[in-house]
Design a protein with these regions (language model features):
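Short amphipathic alpha-helix that is part of the acyltransferase structural core
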Residues: 1-27, 110, 116-151, 173
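A conserved beta-strand-loop-helix scaffold within acyl/acetyltransferase catalytic domains
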Residues: 58-60, 149-198
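Conserved GNAT acetyl-CoA-binding A-motif
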Residues: 82-92, 220-232
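Conserved donor-binding loop and adjoining core beta-sheet/short helix segment
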Residues: 17-21, 27-80, 180-195
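Conserved acetyl-CoA-binding loop-helix of GNAT-fold acetyltransferases
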Residues: 71-79, 199, 205-222, 242
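Conserved active-site alpha-helix within GNAT-family acetyltransferase domains
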Residues: 93-106, 210, 233-250
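Acyl-donor-binding surface of acyltransferase catalytic domains
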Residues: 59-123, 254-256
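Cytosolic beta-strand hydrophobic patch enriched in CBS
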Residues: 43-48, 169-173, 228
Length: 256
């Protein structure tokens, strides 16, 4: 059974989001930013045999499923068809299983969490971002952003997440221009997620991405929280391991 999140059961949703901190904090932060009655962002609790088993967050045609154990998939499949969902983000095992039912294409890499110590250096050249500058950096940095990112909805979402205290966006300038960016994109009570660390091509292979990531780690630790992230590719996970991130499972994305 799928139950709509409202003021009476919102704490149950928060509890389910604790099962995994990257997608969980994303869903919880979206709920804080948009509330329970938004036209585009929808939030549900999946229950089975009277027990809450998963937190669901639908953003347009992207469904995030946060769970801690095995769950049934009938309600998720029905929801996917009802809302014409094109992407499901969750643990790898669920995405792999849904792939056998719904078809499509899957991607996967690691959930990662910071296990290192405090970061000592200061970062005087990293500042709160101008979103137009950040958008330009992202567009230059990777084909994914050129294909999927549209400025107005992207900026509007970040402004809402920032307004409720969930997100912080930063940029790095060198030679009088913005050349890198990174974000704290979502938070829960104990963790904050790093995302969209990017550097324009001519400044790559100089340790700048690592430099930005260390700044974000320091910011999150100063909040009394643990940094976490998802590595986009297994090769990228190797870079994060060099700065004391450890993997704790695999995320999956199913594109239908």
């Amino acid at each position: 059974m799928i139950i709509k999140v409202d003021s009476a059961n919102i704490q149950r949703y928060h509890q389910l989001c604790k099962a995994e901190h990257v997608f969980g904090s994303r869903s919880r932060s979206a709920l804080a930013a948009y509330g329970t009655d938004h036209d585009v962002h929808k939030f549900w609790i999946l229950t089975e045999d009277g027990k809450d088993t998963a937190a669901l967050h639908l953003n347009g045609q992207v469904l995030t499923v946060v769970k801690s154990g095995e769950i049934g998939t009938d309600d998720i499949v029905a929801l996917t068809k009802e809302f014409e969902i094109h992407e499901i983000d969750s643990d790898w095992d669920l995405c792999e299983h849904l792939h056998t039912i719904l078809g499509g294409v899957t991607e996967s890499s690691y959930y990662m969490e910071y296990k290192g110590g405090n970061i000592c250096p200061d970062f005087p050249d990293i500042q709160p971002a101008d979103l137009k500058d950040v958008y330009s950096v992202l567009q230059q940095s990777h084909e994914y952003y050129r294909t999927h990112l549209k400025f107005e909805p992207w900026a509007d979402n970040l402004e809402k997440l920032s307004a409720c205290g969930a997100a912080k966006v930063y940029q790095l300038e060198r030679d009088g221009k913005p050349i890198g960016t990174g974000s704290i994109i979502s938070q829960d009570d104990t963790h904050a997620a790093i995302a969209a660390v990017a550097v324009i091509p001519e400044y790559r292979l100089k340790g700048i991405g690592t430099y930005i990531t260390k700044f974000l780690i320091k910011e999150i630790l100063s909040m009394g929280k643990t940094p976490c992230l998802i590595s986009g590719y297994d090769e990228v996970a190797q870079l994060y391991r060099k700065i004391d991130f450890l993997s704790y499972g695999r995320w999956g994305e199913l594109y239908i």
